[in-house]
C-alpha cells in the first residue's frame, strides 16, 4: 500500500496512457458469492451466477488484481483473456456459474490486515461488461461502477479486524443482502445511529464524535429515509468526484459538512462536473466565474455566455431546476451548449 500522492497518482498516469473501453453487458448477475482474505493484499474468490448462458462473458476488474484461474460450476478451468481492466471468459462448458480466483492491490483503495477501504464505486470484484473505470475529464478520478440494478450478495471476509459493510451482517464478517454495489471498510471505526440510520466514522479523527455527527446529519437523515447507512471515509488523496458517492440505500462521504450539497454532487457524472463548477462559481465566486470564461474547456467556454444569460433571468429558480435535472440525468448526453440553447429557446417560446 502506497498512500503517498505519487503512489495514488499512479492510477491517473496509468489511465492517461491506456485506452478505456465501454461495452454494456449482454447478461445480468443473478448473484455474487464473494470470499475475501485480507493479509498483505487482497486474495479473493468470486462465484458469479448469471441470468443467461453466454459463449463469452465480459467483466471489468481493476488491473491491479491478477487472475490466478477461472472455473465453471463443475470446477473445470475456463480459458480467458485479460487486457488492462477488461476480462473476457470463454464459456466452453455452457455454464451459468463462473468462479474467478484473483489477488492483488490498489494504492488508493487499499485492503490489508491493518485496514480496508473498498468503496462501492470501485471494481474490486468483477463488474459485468466493459466499463470505463477512471474519468479523464476535467474532473479526474474513479467513476461509479455500481450496477444499474440490485442483485443478491453473499460475502465472507477473512480478516484480523472487524469489517463494516453496506449489507446486513449475518455473523462476524459475513454479510448478505440485495444491493447495487458492495462497500467494505475496516480500521478504527465507531458507529452512531440516528433515526435507524447507522453512521460509521473514524474515531481517531477529532472532527467526528456522536454529538457533531448528530448535529450535522440529523436533518439530512430525516429527509432521506432510504439511506440506511452512511460511511465517513478517509480523505486520503481523493479526487473531487471520489469525495462522495450515493448508492441505492447507502452513502459514502469524506465530509459531513454541507451534506445536502454533497449528496446532490455525488449524482453528477464526471463529464458534467465542469458545468456544475461554473454554476457554483456564478452564484458564489464571481471572480472565479470570470476566470472560467477563458480558462476552461472549449465546450464550457462555448456554453458560458448562454449559461450566464439564463441565470441572470432566472427570477423564480425554475431554469436552475431544469439545469440541475440535466446534471444528474446520466442518460442525457447532450453537450452543455446543446442543452442550454434548448433551455433558452424553451423559455423564449413560453
In which residue ranges do the predicted regions lie?
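Short, well-ordered beta-strand segments enriched in hydrophobic/aromatic residues
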Residues: 42-52
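Solvent-exposed beta-hairpin/edge-strand motifs
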Residues: 56-77, 119, 152-163
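A surface-exposed beta-strand-loop module
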Residues: 64-118
